[in-house]
Every structure is written in C-alpha cells, then in structure tokens.
C-alpha cells in the first residue's frame, strides 16, 4: 500500500500579527547643538536651520522691522524672480491679512446704476406691447439673471450683518468699551504689551481713588474724634489729662501709658522735618499744586490775632510769628520789647544783639558828648591853623571836681604868661636889662602826687 503523507501547515489563529511601524522622520542635522525638529522633505535640516544649507531653495525672510530696523531671521522659500521679495509663514500670513483689510476698505459700495440694473428684471411691461418672442426672451433673461444671482452671490460681510437691538446690552458694563481683542486666541507681543499697559493704568487709577476714599474716611473719623473730645473736655474738664489727683491706681496707670504712647508717636528733630517734607510731597502728588500752595501760604502766615482777626504778615524763618508779634512766642530769645519811657510805654520788638537793654529808634538814648566843640578850642600863635581834630579830648568836661579842673588848666595859663613876658622884655631893650624882672604870678602845676608845685622864671 501506498502511504499518503499530509503536511498540516501551522495556522495564525491565536497569534498577534505584527503591525508595521511607520518610519520615524529623521531629526535635524544641525551641528552646533542637538535639534529634535523633523527634517524638511528632501533636506537635511528643519525649517528653523534650513538656511545652513546653501543649496536649499530657501533664503532669509524679506521682512524688516519698522521699530529697530532688523530683518526677520526666519527662512522663506525662494521666489521665481531673482530679486523678488519672499516672506516666512508668519509674515506672509500678516501680509495677507493686511491686504485683505485694505481691500475691504477700498472696495466701493453698491452704485445706484448697478442696483437699478439688477432690479430691472422685476419691472413689469405694459400688456399691449408684449409679443410672444419678446415674452420668451424676457423670460429667459429673467431665468438667467436669477441663476446668476443665486450662483454668484457674494458672501455677507461683518458690516452687512444685523447688529441687533442697541438697548439689549444696556446692562453690560463693557458695552461702551468693547475690546476687539477680547475673544482672540493669539496675541502678538505689541498687543500683549498694550493690553497690560491699559490694565496697569486702570489699576493705578483705582488705587488712587481708593487711597483718596481712605483719606476722606480718616479725616471724617478724626473730625468726629476731635468733636467728641471737645465735648468731653467741656463736660468733665481737663483733670483727667493734667494730673492724677483723685484717680484710682488703675486709672493713673492708664493715664501714664497714654502719655507714653503720645510721646512715642510724636516725632522730634530731624525725623519731624523729614516727615513733614514727605507729607508735603504726598499732598502735592495727590491733591495737586493748588492745595500745596494754599497749605504753604497758610503755614507761613503769622499766628497772632488782632481784634479777633488773624495777622496777614509773613512769619519769620523757623517761627510762627511775624516781626511785629514775635514777642508773643515765649520760647524765642532773640527779641525783647522796647521799654520806652515812663510817660509813653513802647512794646516794639527789638533784637537783643544790639545791646543788653535794646530800644527802638524812637526811644534810643544818645551817649554823652566825647569830643570838644570847635569854638572851645584855644589857638596858640599866629601860624597856620588846622581844623580841629576829633582826637583832641577835653578831660575838663568830664571832671566834676572844680579844684582838680583848675589844676588841670594850670600849665596852659603858665605857658601863656611866659610868652607875654618874653615879648615885653624884647620890646624894652637893654635899658631895662639891669632891672629885675617883674615876678610872675605863681600858679600851680599838677605833680604826680596831685599837689601844686610853685614855679618861677629867672
């Protein structure tokens, strides 16, 4: 017998057929750093680094920025013309949008003749003048125009759409200031900067309004506090703030803490001046220059009141009073009131630096006369006379003792008598030379010990 051999082939039942893997695109061959972007078809670089290949059909984008004058570094396909402009994908899209918007602006509206031509097909002619041929031609023309109008109708633009009832959005806050970029998905850098700038300006204005509101509330609460304090002071008196007499131990402790808190909150010296300058700058920035000028003028005015009217004079530097009312300041030491005279008292302020007891010009006391008048001077001889010198001091005017005055005038008389005697002797000649000269009257000369000493001329 012949044996029949049957070979059973293995089946694929129960086995998972391998799925052919799709070939992954090769990455960019940029050498300076690894780039994971896929290559362009038929090229070795991606769209970002395709300009590294000089033989690739790409060149640099022709767009030049108007702000900084730099050229776009992206790649753009080479145009057919050698000198033609070529843009990258982003700038090509922007250029297309700009051209589309410009075409919308420059496209003229529907002309009246065009509208009449389109509506002429619906005009009914008179019944008597209509013939079968004309009716057939008219019918065909109407069908042609209807088919043309249905097939070639232009799409409706945004300006031609129905805007709806304008009062429907009356309750919306942003209806008057609708942002055209509110629902945009992608923003440029300029648009983002503009949006953030507007938001920051709006936030700044809101902060300023809130700060002014808080200032108003602070002033109102301070006014109420001062009013309540005044009412309490009038009703209870100032004993609670001036002295601890009649208070309990706890109340005295609270009063002590209150005084310490007041001293702690108060500023002194340089800190007070700097705080005042800071406050003036803030007022100038918030309330404006007019309020600051008014505050400065009011702070420079004198604080004195004359007949219930405030003095309008400008105060002196570092003080709150003018020159007329500076003596009302108990802390100043540079001015004193004029004493005046017993009959007419005077209260005019005078600087202390002039003298210990200053006086105004009206009550100023002249010093005693210290120089000898011209008519009281004794001229000796017939020579040239010089004007009196202010250095000639006459001590006799200040001497109150008469004997001492006579003693002081003694040498002057002796010199005069000696000159007269000499002239007489020269006039008598030798005949009187044998006679004894007439004795001169003795006069006293003041010595060092103050006693007169007799003198004689031989």
From Swiss-Prot:
Looking up Pfam families in the UniProt record yields: zf-C3Hc3H (PF13891)
Kindly list the positions at which Phosphothreonine occurs in this protein.
131
Q: Which domain of life is it from?
A: Eukaryota
Region described as Required for interaction with other NSL complex members: 308-364
Q: Where the protein is mainly located, per its record?
A: nucleus
In UniProt terms, what function does this protein have?
Non-catalytic component of the NSL histone acetyltransferase complex, a multiprotein complex that mediates histone H4 acetylation at 'Lys-5'- and 'Lys-8' (H4K5ac and H4K8ac) at transcription start sites and promotes transcription initiation. Required for NSL complex stability and for transcription of intraciliary transport genes in both ciliated and non-ciliated cells by regulating histone H4 acetylation at 'Lys-5'- and 'Lys-12' (H4K5ac and H4K12ac). This is necessary for cilium assembly in ciliated cells and for organization of the microtubule cytoskeleton in non-ciliated cells.
Binding partners and assembly: Component of the NSL complex at least composed of KAT8/MOF, KANSL1, KANSL2, KANSL3, MCRS1, PHF20, OGT1/OGT, WDR5 and HCFC1.
Stated name of the protein = KAT8 regulatory NSL complex subunit 2
Biological source species: Bos taurus
Encoded by which gene? KANSL2
């Amino acid at each position: 017998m012949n044996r029949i051999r049957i070979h059973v082939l293995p089946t694929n039942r129960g086995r998972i057929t391998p799925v052919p893997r799709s070939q992954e695109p090769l990455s960019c061959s940029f050498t300076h750093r690894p780039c994971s972007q896929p290559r362009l078809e038929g090229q070795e670089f991606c769209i970002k680094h395709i300009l590294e290949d000089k033989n690739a059909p790409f060149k640099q984008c022709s767009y030049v920025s108007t702000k900084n004058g730099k050229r776009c570094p992206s790649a753009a396909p080479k145009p057919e013309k050698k000198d033609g402009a070529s843009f990258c994908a982003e700038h090509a899209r922007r250029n297309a949008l700009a051209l589309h918007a410009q075409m919308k602006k420059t496209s003229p509206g529907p002309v009246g003749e065009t509208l009449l031509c389109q509506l002429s097909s619906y005009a009914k002619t008179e019944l008597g003048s209509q013939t079968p041929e004309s009716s057939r031609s008219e019918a065909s023309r109407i069908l042609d125009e209807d088919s043309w109008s249905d097939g070639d109708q232009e799409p409706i633009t945004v300006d031609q759409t129905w805007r709806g009832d304008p009062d429907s959005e009356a309750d919306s806050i942003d209806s008057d200031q609708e942002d055209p970029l509110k629902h945009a998905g992608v923003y440029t850098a300029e648009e983002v900067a503009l949006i953030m700038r507007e938001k920051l300006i709006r936030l700044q204005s809101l902060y300023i309004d809130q700060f002014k509101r808080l200032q108003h509330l602070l002033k109102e609460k301070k006014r109420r506090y001062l009013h309540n304090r005044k009412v309490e002071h009038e009703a209870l008196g100032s004993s609670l703030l001036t002295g601890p007499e009649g208070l309990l131990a706890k109340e005295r402790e609270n009063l002590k803490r209150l005084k310490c808190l007041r001293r702690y909150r108060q500023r002194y010296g340089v800190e007070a001046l700097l705080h005042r300058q800071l406050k003036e700058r803030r007022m100038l920035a918030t309330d404006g220059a007019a309020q600051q000028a008014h505050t400065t003028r009011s702070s420079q005015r004198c604080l004195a009141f004359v007949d219930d009217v405030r003095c309008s004079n400008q105060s002196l530097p570092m003080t709150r009073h003018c020159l007329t009312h500076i003596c009302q300041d108990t802390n100043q030491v540079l001015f004193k009131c004029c004493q005046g005279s017993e009959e007419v008292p005077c209260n005019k302020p005078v600087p202390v630096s002039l003298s210990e007891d200053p006086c105004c010009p009206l009550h100023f006391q002249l010093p005693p006369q210290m120089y000898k008048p011209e008519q009281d001077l004794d001229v000796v001889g017939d020579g040239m006379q010089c004007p009196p010198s202010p250095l000639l001091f006459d001590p006799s005017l200040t001497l109150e003792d008469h004997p001492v005055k006579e003693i002081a005038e003694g040498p002057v008389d002796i010199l005069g008598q000696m000159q007269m005697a000499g002239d007489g002797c020269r006039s008598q000649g030798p005949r009187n030379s044998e006679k004894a000269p007439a004795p001169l009257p003795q006069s006293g000369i003041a010595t060092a010990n103050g006693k007169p000493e007799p003198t004689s001329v031989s």
